[in-house]
A protein has these predicted regions:
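C-terminal functional extensions of proteins
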Residues: 237, 243-293
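Glycine-rich, anion-gripping cofactor-binding loops and their flanking helix/strand elements
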Residues: 46-60, 110-114, 217-253
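Short internal beta-strands
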Residues: 11-18, 39-40, 207-211, 260-263
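Single conserved hydrophobic/aromatic residue that forms the stacking wall/gate
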Residues: 1-10
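N-terminal glycine-rich phosphate/adenylate-binding segment common to multiple enzyme folds
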Residues: 47-135
Length: 293
């Protein structure tokens, strides 16, 4: 948990959402070890998790309760809401931290993960997003935090959610999966992903990922992109198939516990970070590997 080194700073959790969901989430959050209080605010305007209604709520809570830190995951939702909250609080955001050195000092990757910057914030309110894979998860059981309801007041709604389409998959979620099989542009088509990557992923009970090159070529959905501008993953096992290993891709998966690379180019950069590498034609090696599993 990023609370290490910050004493009592991270003991409060904010849950904002519709009344039908927020209270159940607040109850679950109250059981997380290390949380002393859960603040829950309900409004139908919060249900879509849009930045416009939620950022002013964060601003109001910080100012009324004199909080010194605002912390959120460096997720799609966090990257949307927290920059707006930082502007409301007249603070400079520190993004994607991987280490907490003190109440005002954080470490974050730069240059696609090729260097680490130690950043000290001099703002009165520190606004931070956290790379979840860099910290051990807090236990979801054993806590006994109190729950306090917060009046949402008049909620601004300059935008509204028109449509939400959820993707359906029987595979694990890419961001949290313990095993990931990713394919690159060498698959040559979406049919290549379906024929070679998906069966291997299913045998390993793994999530499917893709390089940016494969996504840009239309071989895989954007939601499957792993890398600096996609999802940051750190599974127990990461299998890279036909991925050369551009620094932007490595930035999204190099913290994986075990990395296996399959590529016909022995000079591919992916082999520099791989724990195990196979120089082979993926069209021959992957079906054979899948069959033997």
């Amino acid at each position: 948990s990023p609370s290490r080194g910050l004493g009592d700073v991270y003991k409060r959790q904010l849950v904002a959402g519709s009344s039908s969901h927020a209270k159940a989430v607040a109850e679950a959050a109250s059981k997380v070890q290390g949380v002393s209080k859960v603040l829950v605010s309900t409004s139908d305007a919060f249900s879509a998790l849009l930045a416009e209604p939620i950022a002013p709520l964060i601003e109001s809570l910080v100012k009324s309760k004199s909080y010194t830190h605002v912390v959120a995951g460096h997720t799609a939702v966090g990257r949307d809401i927290i920059p707006r909250a930082a502007v409301c609080l007249d603070s400079s955001q520190v993004s994607d931290i991987i280490e907490v050195q003190g109440e005002d000092t954080f470490v974050r990757p730069i240059y696609a993960g090729n260097a680490l910057a130690t950043v000290m914030s001099k703002d009165g309110v520190k606004v931070v997003t956290v790379r979840g894979t860099a910290f051990d998860a807090a236990s979801a059981e054993g806590g006994s935090a109190s729950v306090e309801e917060v009046d949402a007041g008049e909620v601004p709604q300059p935008t509204k959610l028109v449509q939400e389409k959820m993707s359906e998959s029987t595979r694990p979620d890419l961001a949290t999966a313990s095993r990931v099989v990713s394919g690159g542009r060498a698959l040559k088509s979406s049919e290549g992903f379906a024929k070679y990557i998906e069966p291997l992923a299913d045998k390993l009970e793994a999530a499917v990922g893709a390089s940016r090159a494969a996504v840009d070529a239309g071989y895989a959905d954007n939601a499957l992109q792993v890398g600096q501008t996609g999802k940051i993953v750190a599974p127990e096992l990461y299998v890279a198939v036909g991925i050369s290993g551009a620094i932007q891709h490595l930035a999204g998966m190099k913290d994986s516990k075990t990395i296996v690379a399959i590529n016909k180019d022995p000079e591919a950069p992916i082999f520099q970070v791989a724990d195990m590498g196979l120089v082979a034609d993926l069209y021959e090696a992957v079906p054979e590997l899948t069959e033997k599993l």
